[in-house]
A protein has these predicted regions:
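Conserved catalytic/switch belt of AAA+ P-loop NTPases
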Residues: 84-130
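AAA+/P-loop NTPase substrate/partner-engagement loops
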Residues: 26, 38-70, 79-86
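A short helix-turn-beta junction within AAA+ P-loop NTPase domains corresponding to the substrate/partner-engaging
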Residues: 144-164
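Loop/turn-to-beta-strand initiation segments
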Residues: 68-72, 127-135
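N-terminal pre-Walker A segment at the start of P-loop NTPase domains
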Residues: 1-13
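Conserved AAA+ ATPase small/helical "lid" subdomain
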Residues: 175-242
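Walker B catalytic acidic pair
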Residues: 75-77
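Walker A/P-loop nucleotide-binding motif
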Residues: 12-32
Length: 248
C-alpha cells in the first residue's frame, strides 16, 4: 500500500520521483505497471528505460517525455543509480529529480560535444525543461543508491517477509503470464510453494520462483509427471536459494 501511495503521488505530480528498492522477483515492476495502466498510462520503449542504458538514451527518453503528466519508468536501474553508475547518467538523473525546481520545470542537460540527434537523425537541444514524473526501480538497497539521487526523491525499501511475499503472489497470480499459464498450474504452484515454506525447505520465494513452479506444472499431464514436476521444482527452489552475490 505504501508503494502504491508513492507511485500515486508521482502520477498526480505531487512528487517528481520515487525510487523503489528491493530484491529481484518480488513483483515491483509488475505492480507498478498495473498501477500505471489503471491510471491510463501505456508503458512502452518510448517512456521506459530498462537495464543498462547510455546517457544519450536516458536523456532522449526524458526529452521525449518532458511534459507535465508524462511518466518515465526506469526499470532494473542498477547500472544508473548504484555506486558504479556513469557520472553523466547520475548528473542527468539529478537534474531530472530536482524537487526544488520552479514552475518552468527541471533543467536537464546532456553535456556532449558536437550536435545531439535523436534516433531519426533529428537535432535535439542539449538542455530542456522537464516536468515529467519518474519511477525508478532497482535491486539495490537504499543505502547503495547515489546520495544525491536519494536526497532528491522519495525512496522506499521493499523488504517483505515470506508470508507477505506469498500473499502478494496470490493477489497478482491471475495476471501472471495469463496467456501462457493456466490457472490450474498456477494454483498448484501456489499450493506447493506454501507447502515448501511450511516444511521449512530452503526456498527463495519470489514471483520468479512462482513462475518457475507454474511452468513445470503446466507440463505435468499425469500422476507420474506430477511427481517428477515436484521433484524438479524442489531442485530449482533449492538452487535458487543458494545463489550468492545478491545486491539486496
Amino acid at each position: 500500500k505504501e508503494m502504491q501511495l508513492y507511485v500515486k503521488m508521482v502520477i498526480k505530480g505531487i512528487q517528481p520521483a520515487v525510487i523503489l528498492c528491493g530484491a529481484p522477483g518480488i513483483g515491483k515492476t509488475f505492480r507498478v505497471k498495473q498501477q500505471l495502466k489503471a491510471a491510463g498510462y501505456t508503458m512502452t520503449a518510448d517512456n521506459t528505460v530498462k537495464g543498462k542504458c547510455t546517457p544519450r538514451q536516458l536523456y532522449l527518453t526524458l526529452y521525449n517525455n518532458k511534459g507535465k503528466g508524462d511518466i518515465v519508468l526506469v526499470d532494473d536501474a542498477d547500472s544508473l543509480v548504484g555506486p558504479k553508475a556513469p557520472e553523466d547518467c547520475i548528473n542527468i538523473l539529478k537534474a531530472a529529480l530536482d524537487s526544488t525546481a520552479d514552475d518552468e520545470g527541471r533543467l536537464v542537460s546532456y553535456k556532449v560535444s558536437g550536435e545531439l540527434k535523436d534516433d531519426e537523425g533529428v537535432p535535439v537541444p542539449k538542455s530542456h525543461y522537464n516536468k515529467c514524473g519518474m519511477i525508478v526501480i532497482t535491486n539495490y538497497s537504499v543505502g547503495q543508491i547515489d546520495t544525491a539521487l536519494r536526497n532528491r526523491a522519495f525512496t522506499q525499501s521493499l523488504d517483505f517477509s515470506t508470508k507477505d511475499l506469498l500473499e502478494i503472489i496470490r493477489g497478482i497470480m491471475p495476471n501472471i503470464e495469463s496467456n501462457h499459464l493456466s490457472m490450474s498450474s498456477k494454483a498448484k504452484a501456489m499450493n506447493y510453494l506454501e507447502k515448501l515454506v511450511e516444511e521449512g525447505k530452503p526456498i527463495e520465494v519470489s514471483c520468479r520462483s512462482f513462475i518457475t513452479c507454474a511452468r513445470i506444472y503446466e507440463n505435468a499431464e499425469d500422476d507420474e509427471a506430477l511427481q517428477l514436476a515436484e521433484k524438479m521444482i524442489a531442485e530449482q527452489m533449492r538452487n535458487s536459494a543458494i545463489r550468492g552475490g545478491k545486491k539486496f
